């Protein structure tokens, strides 16, 4: 990031660690090419995100960033302004970098919610929803689910009791939804109450510990599993749920929809049906061939 990027082209990117699995560059650069937009989307793999890093991005002409593991909570803290999801849940996955200020957004929840509505809307109505994990993605997803008015009860299962209880408090305080932190043992004993499982931890991700978070015995044909890990296409958790007959929402759908919102924030251009269809096909082909 030492040299200034092309002044006529707009430059965006993704920041996180690790990023070898990321398909975000494929998504954004392909749409820029399809639409004839003079822009590029780069990869910035860094274990640290701080004010110095942000200033380096600004000095290099970076106008916007997708933010992923492990920087979503830090991204919110570094912003001067933030959307309502970021403000309430204290996590952001998108930064717009202006000359004098940084604006944070969270498109995770919107991407996840749209995926559920398209592929398994019934799972929101017939039972309770449990979110596995308490990181930045879990925060955004919990907020959008609570704000949707479609659910009454949310469970959160995480080994980090402190952050889990914080998320439950924020959701219960800012919505009409009761969110409860439960242990993995308690979750197993209440599995008949669950219709939708949303997995948000890195377990199963390419290059990470395989998991699964839950065994095949937990799932049944009346459940839907939404594993937001998209690379590989079938994680050990997805395979376990499939064996039990559960319905699957692929993580690539959330990646697709949250990226479409980021594209709009970055460029000011609303994605159309063709953009979504082409991107879905590219993701499917890439993940199938890996």
Swiss-Prot record:
Keyword Heme: no
Task of the protein: Involved in the biosynthesis of the chorismate, which leads to the biosynthesis of aromatic amino acids. Catalyzes the reversible NADPH linked reduction of 3-dehydroshikimate (DHSA) to yield shikimate (SA).
Pathway it works in: Metabolic intermediate biosynthesis; chorismate biosynthesis; chorismate from D-erythrose 4-phosphate and phosphoenolpyruvate: step 4/7
Pfam family, one: Shikimate_dh_N
Family annotation (PANTHER family): BIFUNCTIONAL 3-DEHYDROQUINATE DEHYDRATASE_SHIKIMATE DEHYDROGENASE, CHLOROPLASTIC, SHIKIMATE DEHYDROGENASE
Keyword field contains NADP: yes
InterPro entries: Aminoacid_DH-like_N_sf, NAD(P)-bd_dom_sf, SDH_C, Shikimate_DH, Shikimate_DH-bd_N, Shikimate_DH_fam
GO CC, one annotated term: cytosol
Biological source species: Leptospira borgpetersenii serovar Hardjo-bovis (strain JB197)
Catalytic activity: shikimate + NADP(+) = 3-dehydroshikimate + NADPH + H(+)
Active site: 72
Highest taxon, organism lineage: Bacteria
Record-listed E.C. numbers: 1.1.1.25
Protein name: Shikimate dehydrogenase (NADP(+))
């Amino acid at each position: 990031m030492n040299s200034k990027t092309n002044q006529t082209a707009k430059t965006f990117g993704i920041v996180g660690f690790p990023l070898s699995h990321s398909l975000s560059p494929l998504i954004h650069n392909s749409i820029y090419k399809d639409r004839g937009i003079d822009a590029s989307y780069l990869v910035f793999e860094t274990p640290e995100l701080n004010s110095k890093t942000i200033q380096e991005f600004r000095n290099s002409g970076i106008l916007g960033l997708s933010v992923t593991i492990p920087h979503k909570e830090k991204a919110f803290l570094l912003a001067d302004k933030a959307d309502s999801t970021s403000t309430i849940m204290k996590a952001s996955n998108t930064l717009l970098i202006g000359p004098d200020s940084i604006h944070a957004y969270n498109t995770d929840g919107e991407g996840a919610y749209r995926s559920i509505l398209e592929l398994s809307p019934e799972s929101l109505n017939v039972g309770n929803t449990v979110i596995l994990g308490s990181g930045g993605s879990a925060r955004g997803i919990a907020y959008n689910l609570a704000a949707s008015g479609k659910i009454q009860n949310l469970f959160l299962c995480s080994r980090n009791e402190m952050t889990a209880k914080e998320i439950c408090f924020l959701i219960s305080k800012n919505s009409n939804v009761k969110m409860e932190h439960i242990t993995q043992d308690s979750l197993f004993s209440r599995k008949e109450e669950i219709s939708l499982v949303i997995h948000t931890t890195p377990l199963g991700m390419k290059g990470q510990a395989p998991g699964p978070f839950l065994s095949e015995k937990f799932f049944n044909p009346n459940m839907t599993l939404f594993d937001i890990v998209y690379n590989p296409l079938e994680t050990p958790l997805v395979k376990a749920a499939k064996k039990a007959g559960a319905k699957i929402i692929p993580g690539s759908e959330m990646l697709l929809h949250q990226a479409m919102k980021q594209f709009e924030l970055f460029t000011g251009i609303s994605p159309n049906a063709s953009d979504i269809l082409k991107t879905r096909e590219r993701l499917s082909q890439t993940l199938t061939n890996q």
